[in-house]
UniProtKB/Swiss-Prot annotation:
This is Meiosis-specific protein HOP1. Disulfide bonds: none annotated. SUPFAM superfamilies: The spindle assembly checkpoint protein mad2 (SSF56019). Keywords: Chromosome, DNA-binding, Meiosis, Metal-binding, Nucleus, Zinc, Zinc-finger. One of its GO terms (biological process) is reciprocal meiotic recombination.
Length: 605
């Protein structure tokens, strides 16, 4: 009889990855990703690159290059500095913009876009999203689409993740990234690159990375994707080290292959919207117990899938589809949530969209023939800054028209009256300040300087606390002093009033185009009034300078009698209170600070 001695297996001990190691590994992964995509997408000549191998085990003390199989490593391409100004610029974006922002823990996402002519019309996009955890208690996983998830019995909060574990995750992620990128359609010879950065709530208001400029309120960059897109094809995966978490996705508008497949239905997607919607879904998942499952797909894949599936029934070729969770049951193009008491809801007869009455002139009936989108067509981007300005001015004016007792006691009270608190941010305040500037320019508002307003026009006089900056008197180019009270007059029948807020409803694309051009021109005037070169001063109440622009004789402008809208039996203006029940009080998306590269990178060889 033989005796076998039982030997207790040796327990493997791991040294947890440090924050510094995690930072360096994240930078290595980004550098490899940029090098590989630049090579595989033909952005630069071959002599700009150098071959390297990423070996996860290289950090081990007993690492021996001779004993390491190539199967345990991955061949990658990296960019060389000093051989191309364009390649150097790409590396500068990465090192001076991205790496610094990650160290400050303020970068939420970076979007590297490839385009042909218009930097907001992307042909291809690579998006990286970032999360940070100071308490080191984040679940660890490599979320590659279609791969099995780890054991459900493990306690990820107590699991130690070493540097080697993290490097192996990077290797898996890079392999999938290379496979996906290799499968994309070839790009045209001449193309351009732009980088956008979206920041989280930790960012300093004045922070601006080198080589970047603010683009928070610029037109968003979007990508046209087919409604029958294979969702798994866009997601690369997620790296989580307990210190940093980064997810990578690829979106490509390879129109040639789509059209060959007979697909003519598309939607336009803002890559950053996927990140923000993913954030909301994560919050929901935290409150719902997870069901047993053998396979998982990434959050980005799920979000895009929901977006595509929700648009199948009514999608039109190259139609922009609004997927706006902000307004709940109301899908008004203004994109803001309005308090229940501020407006009734109207319906567009053409597209059945639900709209805010104050955005559509407090129209008498419960439905309108066509909304802005139906009139203008699918090329209207409701996220255009000029369009958002237009809707804000119309909203403010119509709210003031129905408020018989005069202007609210303060600018903040005005904003509170027609915009839900959750939607109030610096962008909203700035647009309201611009709206008031337009009203002062048109003499719809007139500052009281001791004289009497016109006897031929009916005014409502109010004392108002100015508690929002940026309110400028046009002809003097002087800002009203914040936290000071002023008296001014409001009228609905100024002969200089602009038609884009006086008209109850739009009636043609040409008219809307004209309105948007008027907004653009007025924005330039407002910007000049705010610029340092204008030598802005605080307005002195005792100043003898005129506060109204002179009316130029000989100019005729349509005169509007808005008193007809105040007749109790005819108009919804006075009785404009919401009657809808169970209004969806969904949490609105936040406005994030966004920066864009000052220069675009040209690739043509």
């Amino acid at each position: 009889m033989s005796n076998k001695q039982l030997v207790k297996p040796k327990t493997e001990t791991k040294t947890e990855i440090t924050t510094e190691q995690s930072q360096k590994l994240l930078q290595t992964m980004l550098t490899m990703s940029f090098g590989c995509l630049a090579f595989l997408r033909g952005l630069f000549p071959d002599d700009i690159f150098v071959d390297q191998r990423f070996v996860p085990e290289k950090v081990e003390k007993n690492y021996n290059k001779q004993n390491t199989s190539q199967n345990n490593s991955i061949k990658i391409k990296t960019l060389i500095r000093g051989k191309s100004a364009q390649a150097d610029l790409l590396l500068d974006w990465l090192e001076k913009g991205v790496f610094k922002s990650i160290r400050l823990k303020c970068l939420k996402a970076l979007s590297l876009g490839i385009f042909l002519e218009d930097p907001t019309d992307l042909l291809e996009n690579y998006i990286f999203s970032f999360d940070y955890d100071e308490e080191n208690n984040v679940n660890i996983n490599v979320n590659l689409s279609g791969n099995k998830k780890g054991s459900k019995n493990a306690d990820p909060e107590n699991e130690t993740i070493s540097l080697l574990d993290s490097r192996r995750m990077v290797q898996q992620l890079m392999r999938r990234f290379i496979i996906i990128t290799q499968s994309l359609e070839p790009l045209p010879q001449k193309k351009f690159l732009t980088m956008r950065l979206m920041f989280n709530d930790n960012v300093d208001e004045d922070y601006q990375p080198e080589l970047f400029k603010d683009a928070t309120f610029d037109k968003r960059a979007t990508l046209k994707v087919p409604t029958n897109l294979d969702n798994d094809a866009i997601d690369v995966g997620t790296l989580n080290t307990k210190h940093h978490k980064v997810a990578l996705s690829v979106l490509s508008a390879a129109t040639s292959s789509m059209e060959k497949a007979g697909n003519t239905n598309f939607i336009r997607v803002d890559p950053f919207d996927l990140i923000l919607q993913q954030q909301e879904e994560n919050k929901l998942e935290e409150s719902v117990p997870t069901k047993p499952q053998n396979f998982v797909t990434s959050q980005t894949t799920n979000v895009l899938g929901n977006l595509l599936n929700s648009s199948q029934a009514s999608i039109q070729p190259t139609q922009f589809v609004s997927n706006n969770p902000v307004t709940g049951i109301c899908s008004c193009e203004c994109g803001l949530e309005v308090p229940k008491a501020a407006t009734v809801l109207k319906t567009c007869k053409s597209c059945r969209k639900t709209l805010h009455g104050i955005c559509y002139g407090n129209f008498l009936h419960s439905s309108i023939e066509k909304c802005f989108t139906c009139i203008f067509g699918p090329s209207l981007d409701t996220k255009w800054s000029k369009f958002q300005d237009l809707m804000m001015i119309r909203k403010v004016f119509r709210f003031l028209v129905r408020k018989k007792k005069g202007f609210p006691a303060s600018i903040t009270e005005l904003i509170d009256s027609f915009i839900n608190v959750e939607d109030q941010n610096n962008e909203v305040k700035e647009r309201v300040a611009f709206a008031l500037f337009v009203f002062f320019l048109d003499e719809t508002l007139c500052l009281d300087n001791g004289g009497k307003p016109s006897q031929t026009i009916r005014y409502v006089t109010s004392s108002v606390l100015v508690d929002v900056k940026g309110i400028v008197i046009p002809n003097t180019r002087k800002q009203l002093n914040v936290n000071h009270e002023y008296k001014w007059h409001f009228t609905t029948s100024s002969p200089k009033a602009e038609s884009f807020y006086q008209e109850v409803l739009p009636n043609s694309r040409k008219q809307v185009e004209s309105w948007l051009q008027d907004i653009t021109n007025l924005r330039k005037v407002y910007s000049e009034a705010l610029s340092p070169s204008s030598t802005l001063q605080e307005l002195d109440l005792n100043s003898s300078l005129p506060t109204q622009d002179p009316i130029i004789s000989g100019q005729k402008r349509r005169r509007y009698d808005l008193d007809e809208y105040l007749e109790e039996d005819k108009s919804s203006v006075v009785n404009d209170t919401i009657k809808a029940k169970d209004f969806d009080e969904s949490v609105p998306a936040k406005i994030r600070k966004i920066s864009v590269s000052k220069k675009t990178l040209k690739s043509n060889w």
